[in-house]
């Protein structure tokens, strides 16, 4: 229900295009701080660019269960050096982030509780659910 309400609150006219959709550390090969390759393009789709940005932050911007503002600031600065966010995108960031966290939690629940239960990953969705109550740097 919350995802449906969030989807309604996120403007439909945010700038869109082809996005990766799954930029997490395990999908990036790097060396000495340089990105050498991106992997796992099975989630590629046409979606808002800001959704890809916050999804990347979900993957890279948290440490020990807390958001790391410096990582958000670096990610945003790098992103905006190429394409500045619109005012509407900036305003939508909290809802986009919440939507992305819920989507990851739902996927992890399906994958590790329903599809392949009983592994060491069974409670990985809980990590995402705990993020919903944290204060974000945007």
Protein language model annotation of sequence segments:
Residues 1-21, 84:
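An alpha-helical support segment within catalytic cores of ATP-dependent transferases
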Residues 32-36:
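Active-site beta-strand-loop-beta-strand hairpin of nuclease catalytic cores
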Residues 39-44:
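Activation of the activation-loop gatekeeper triad in protein kinase-fold domains
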Residues 85-97:
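All-alpha amphipathic helical-bundle segments outside canonical DNA-binding/catalytic cores
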Residues 104-138:
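ATP/Mg2+ or Mg2+-diphosphate-binding catalytic cores
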């Amino acid at each position: 229900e919350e995802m449906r309400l969030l989807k309604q609150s996120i403007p439909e006219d945010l700038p869109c295009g082809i996005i990766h959709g799954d930029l997490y550390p395990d999908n990036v090969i790097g060396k000495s701080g340089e990105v050498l390759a991106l992997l796992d393009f099975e989630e590629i789709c046409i979606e808002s660019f800001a959704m890809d940005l916050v999804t990347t932050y979900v993957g890279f911007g948290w440490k020990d269960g807390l958001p790391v503002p410096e990582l958000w600031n670096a990610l945003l600065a790098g992103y905006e050096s190429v394409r500045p966010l619109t005012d509407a995108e900036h305003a939508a960031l909290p809802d986009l982030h919440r939507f992305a966290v819920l989507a990851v939690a739902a996927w992890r629940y399906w994958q590790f509780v329903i599809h392949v239960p009983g592994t060491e990953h069974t409670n990985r969705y809980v990590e995402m659910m705990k993020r919903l109550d944290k204060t974000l740097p945007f």
